[in-house]
């Protein structure tokens, strides 16, 4: 069975870089990133491996909603300068770079879903909880820094929803980390309670007459924001990749 290890490049590198005593020490950064990659390869024994990098183009999500990810800290200058050399060095480790035009998430999602559709296993290495919408028997998410797979049941319990309701949940209450707005006046607690009762966003909107007038009005007036938020949160899984699985093969030696 094919097993594809998909590393969220900047998610890994920026966290390692943030822990360095000297942010300009690119040699130490490379050593630590290389050490992390070797550990991931040893631990998961993939047949194929890709490290996916964010690109510089403005995301389609930003074009759709100007405030998307507004306020995010820019990449430190030293890291931005050293990143091209770091990518080149990593190629010697059987970690094959895949460069996205803008956000890496949609490329990660496409790679994972295409492999899962053939019966293979995809392991995504990232702490980005937005990727949890992809989880299935064939797709799992590994937190390198915690040294464990994400506990989906604990995540569901924390939010008070089931995994398949994640996008509907974000449509209702938004995602503050990515500046996805949600519906004004609907918070996480209300969102989880509504989904527990009505099971889906579609059912909820078909049942507005069963709600109190105040909450029904919020939902009615916020319908467009819910649609927008759902679209912003949903990962694309059918992007053209311009590569073959064999391009990502790990040297068995």
Swiss-Prot record:
Binding residue positions for K(+): 172, 181, 183, 186
Metal-binding is among the record's keywords: yes
Gene3D superfamilies: 5' to 3' exonuclease, C-terminal subdomain, 5'-nuclease
Stated name of the protein: Flap endonuclease Xni
Start and end residues of each stretch annotated as Interaction with DNA: 185-190
Keywords linked to the UniProt accession: DNA-binding, Endonuclease, Hydrolase, Magnesium, Metal-binding, Nuclease, Potassium
5'-3' exonuclease domain boundaries: 162-251
Taxonomic lineage: Bacteria, Pseudomonadati, Pseudomonadota, Gammaproteobacteria, Alteromonadales
Highest taxon of source: Bacteria
Uppermost EC category: hydrolase
Any one biological process term the GO annotation gives: DNA replication, Okazaki fragment processing
Gene Ontology MF terms in the entry: 5'-3' exonuclease activity; 5'-flap endonuclease activity; DNA binding; magnesium ion binding; potassium ion binding
The family this protein is said to belong to: Belongs to the Xni family.
Cofactor annotation comment: Binds 2 Mg(2+) per subunit. Only one magnesium ion has a direct interaction with the protein, the other interactions are indirect. Binds 1 K(+) per subunit. The potassium ion strongly increases the affinity for DNA.
EC identifiers of the protein: 3.1.-.-
Statement: the UniProt record of this protein carries the keyword Magnesium: yes
CDD domains per UniProt: H3TH_53EXO (cd09898), PIN_53EXO (cd09859)
Coiled coil: none
Cofactor(s) recorded in Swiss-Prot or TrEMBL: Mg(2+); K(+)
Disulfide bonds: none
Functional summary from the UniProt entry: Has flap endonuclease activity. During DNA replication, flap endonucleases cleave the 5'-overhanging flap structure that is generated by displacement synthesis when DNA polymerase encounters the 5'-end of a downstream Okazaki fragment.
InterPro entries attached to this UniProt entry: 5-3_exonucl_a-hlix_arch_N, 5-3_exonuclease, 5-3_exonuclease_C_sf, DNA_polI_H3TH, FEN, HhH2, PIN-like_dom_sf, Xni
Binding, Mg(2+): 105
């Amino acid at each position: 069975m094919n097993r594809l290890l998909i590393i969220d490049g900047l998610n890994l590198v920026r966290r390692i870089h943030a822990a360095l005593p000297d942010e300009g020490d690119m040699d130490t950064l490379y050593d630590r990133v290389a050490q992390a990659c070797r550990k991931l390869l040893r631990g998961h024994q993939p047949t194929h491996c890709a490290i996916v990098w964010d690109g510089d183009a403005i995301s389609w999500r930003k074009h759709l909603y100007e405030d998307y990810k507004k306020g995010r800290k820019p990449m430190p200058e030293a890291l931005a300068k050293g990143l091209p050399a770091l990518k080149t060095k990593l190629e010697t480790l059987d970690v094959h770079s895949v460069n996205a035009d803008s956000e890496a998430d949609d490329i990660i999602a496409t790679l994972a879903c295409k492999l899962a559709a053939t019966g293979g296993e995809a392991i995504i290495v990232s702490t980005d909880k937005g990727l949890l919408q992809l989880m299935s028997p064939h797709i799992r998410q590994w937190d390198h820094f915690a040294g464990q797979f994400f506990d989906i049941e604990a995540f569901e319990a924390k939010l008070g929803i089931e995994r398949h309701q994640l996008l509907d949940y974000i449509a209702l209450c938004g995602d503050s980390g990515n500046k996805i707005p949600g519906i004004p006046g609907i918070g996480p607690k209300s969102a989880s309670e509504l989904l527990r009762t009505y099971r889906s966003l579609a059912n909820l909107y078909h049942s507005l007459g069963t709600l109190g007038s105040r909450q029904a009005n919020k939902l009615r007036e916020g319908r467009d924001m819910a649609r927008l938020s759902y679209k912003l949160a949903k990962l694309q899984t059918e992007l053209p990749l311009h590569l073959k699985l064999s391009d990502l093969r790990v040297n068995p030696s």
